[in-house]
A protein has these predicted regions:
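Short C-terminal beta-strand
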Residues: 91-103
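Conserved transmitter core of two-component histidine kinases
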Residues: 1-8, 51, 85-88
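ATP phosphate-binding glycine-rich loop and adjacent ATP-lid/helix-beta elements
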Residues: 63-94
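Glycine-rich acidic phosphate-binding loop
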Residues: 55-61
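Conserved ATP-binding N-box helix of the HATPase_c
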Residues: 16-39
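Conserved short strand/loop->alpha-helix "switch" segment adjacent to the catalytic nucleotide/phosphoryl-transfer site
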Residues: 2-23, 65
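Structural motif
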Residues: 35, 46-48, 89-91
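Short beta-strand/loop element within the Bergerat-fold HATPase_c
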Residues: 38-48, 55
Length: 106
């Protein structure tokens, strides 16, 4: 599996951990469901935080695809830190994370 990262990854611990979890989940899903060989990550700083786009070179998602356990758990982690997560399944899988710098307090 190849992973191509464009931009930089935030070094703030909470943001970096969620980004890592997202990339790992997308690699797993690319192998299991899309039968792809490459995951593309775009990560860039925006006002107040970071935006991350993740997609792959695999097969188009089946009609009616939805978030499973791994993506749902990722969504919970993102929202717990005050971020947003968008998933799109058409025409290709796309995961978008918007993560604030600082997040929420423990």
């Amino acid at each position: 599996m190849d992973v191509e990262i464009e931009g930089e990854i935030c070094e703030e611990t909470k943001v970096a951990l969620i980004t890592d979890k997202a990339i790992r989940e997308c690699i797993t899903n690319c192998i299991r469901h899309a039968h792809g060989s490459k995951v593309y990550v775009q990560s860039y700083k925006v006002l107040g935080g970071w935006k991350i786009h993740i997609t792959n070179d695999g097969e188009r998602p089946k009609e009616g695809s939805k978030e499973g356990g791994g993506l749902s758990a990722l969504r919970e982690a993102v929202e717990r830190e005050g971020g947003q997560m968008i998933t799109r399944f058409d025409p290709r899988f796309l995961l978008v994370l918007e993560l604030p710098v600082g997040g929420t307090e423990d």
